[in-house]
Amino acid sequence: PLHYLALSEVLDEVEVIPVISTEGYGDFPGPEVLTLSGTKNPAELKDYIDSLYREEYYKGVVRDDVVDLVPDYMRPLIKERVVGKRVPEARKAVVELLRSLGKHDTIYEVLNGPIYCRCGTEIVVKVIRDQWYIDYDNPFWKSWTLKALDQIDVVPESSKRDLARAIFSLKKRACSRTRGLGVKLPWDESQIIDSLSDSTIYMAFYTISHKLNYDPEKLNEEFWNYVMLGNGNPIDLSKSIGIPEDELKALREEFSYWYPLDSRHSGRDLVQNHLPYMIYNHLAIFGENLVPRRIVVNGFVRVGGKKMSKSFRNIYPLYKAIEEYGVDPVRLALTVSSELSEDTDFDTSSIKAITDQLRRMYDLAVNVSKLKSSGENGLPEKWLLSLIHYKVREVNDLMNSLDFRKAFNVILYEFYDIVRDYISMVNFPNKYTLKTVLNIWSRLISPGAPHIAEEIWSMFNEDLVSLQRYPSPEELQVDGQALVQLEYIRYLIEQVKALASLTNKQPEKLIIYVSNSDELGLLRAVLRGLKDRNNLRELSSAIGLREENLKTLLEKIQTLPSTLRDFITVYSIDEFKTIIDNLNFLMRKLDVDEIQVYRSDDSSAPDIKGKKNSTLPLMPGIVIL
């Protein structure tokens, strides 16, 4: 219909040859568009043409008389494969027939066009003759690249498979073009080097770019061969190009210091092109010893759960976010909203929540700075520093594995909760202990929130936190006994809260039954067996417990905090005494008026709701009243 309309505007008469028959339409539905062509509503004409195309494509069949339109030798094939067929099937048959006869040609069309350059110019597809290419399908080079990929740490691991598939599928690729900005191809100045060909190793240039204060004419091929490949003699090179020998050596040392790349971060859309080319080209130029050590594939930024797009009207410039919320909350919100390889959702509610949490941490630091007395230095202080030791270790491990989301969640929230628990435990908080913790916290959060880190650091120190080393767990000693006892108390609080939530009842009084300390040996035996990776049958036989009972015990053990599981095999605990010693803290934390504690083997103790005999080591029976 559209073609008919176009032809009718330039020709007096248009001969129409019907090919498709569509039920409900005449032999020539095209001329009907002339009736609508004068409409004042172009959308009406477009809707009609689109609906006609759809009807013909999905419901139309090829007419019987099309055989009269082809030469005699083709008529049997047309009658067999095309006549009476629906349009999609007939199209495929015609293409195959023309291909077999050598009578077909291919026209490439940009289906999602028009496409525009960043400068606003419409992009056109052009065939370039005598174009240079790089043969990424060379079998030796391809196998060498796949082998090198095995030695590269890829985050996430799934992207390594995607990279391998991309490398395996790469063919010859043009490395030059005839127009646009760029460097001319050295051996063919009619061509310009395509950016994707050489931009995959530009990181090597960054290593020395800040020191290249020389005339460009001096930076010849021998210069680059020495600086980046170590080829040649700096004495001879110095005489040849006029750059002092010590400066040449310094450039070579600078490059050698930074290369190979420790970590290459890139968007996941570049897994199919830039990143595999980078590995290929690093191998070809520098050899396998200087390929990147790690490749990290990032996701994209989304706003309100949607991809940033002008059509969605949700473009949120970074400067606007910083002006509204500040640098630290924006950085942390983008970091903790998703895993590194996933899309990051820019959510204003998340930013506000992080802002509130930073303010809470700041207020806490202010209160600590105002403390007059050092306070006590007992079990709670030892527990606090011991637990912070493990949190620092956890954060370091997460940072090293690039799991920034979990790392900053630990720093932001778990640290704060731990400090609040400590303050609730004691009558007079120890200022020195809290200062130690806040100094560690400032250094931990500094990469994500440098401004708040400096503010809190300055409350207790004269210099800058940005000049300090990142915290190490070795800075703090561990008191296993204190850690076991107070982690048990915190675990007990969690269990009571979970039970209260399950029963939908706010407790006023608690009855707690604890296991006999002698039964702790059973739990230790199970935990040691798990560390030794014994299977269920071996473990059951070793400790003399039926497999069904062992399964139940293992399920309950998994609910214990990791610190308890790790240290209970070394340190003992008297659950009864530990609870009694921390009754005030428990009552404040759980907001109850009374707590009664009994040993499960105490014959004089009442059995409330059958909980007396339900205890296991570190897993008390709890009654809410």
Regions of interest found by a model, annotated:
Residues 374-396, 409-413, 417-494:
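Acidic, turn-prone loop/beta-hairpin segments
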Residues 1, 10-11, 17-23, 164-342:
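Alpha-helical recognition segments enriched in aromatics with Gly/Pro capping
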